[in-house]
Amino acid sequence: MDELKKGYKVIKNFLSTEEINLLTDYTRMKHRVNTTQFDLGQSDQGDTMFYGDPATDSLMLNKRKLMEKETGLELLPTYSFWRMYSYLADLKKHKDRPSCEISVTVKINSCGAKWPIYMGGTEIELENGDGVAYKGCDIEHWRNEFEGDWHAQTFLHYVNKNGPNKEWFRDKRPLFGITK
């Protein structure tokens, strides 16, 4: 896994322009009508969050080959989710659970406000469509408070097909595109 020797790797243009446009519209529309899907786990803000969304689970499946190329590993997809962050949102410093052994966090789009992610103390600013592949269980990652209006981010998670966490395939769900 030399490709992730620092624990992370920036992948420019992880999403195409068409994927950015599609996911921007999709996440903003779902956010506007959301009344039930909020996450208080990694942020104090209670931002819109969708686990196992069919759109991002499909993206995770379609980006597996790219992730294998970027990491040098054979990967099994586990789950995806996306969040729409708002003013004063943050991401608490943490490491991930076993189903997030190899992950990529991807900036879909935002209001334009800068909001870096920190990987093991290194500040990384992503442009729309860029991603950071990282060893989710090994490297601490976080974000400070967001000072913009909106920021759409997706997270695609995988495990090493030949590693100790392969039991987490599909995050132990019977199908992709559903919650547990």
Where is each model-derived feature located?
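Charged phosphate-binding loop/patch that engages nucleotide di/tri-phosphates or the phosphate backbone
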Residues: 174-180
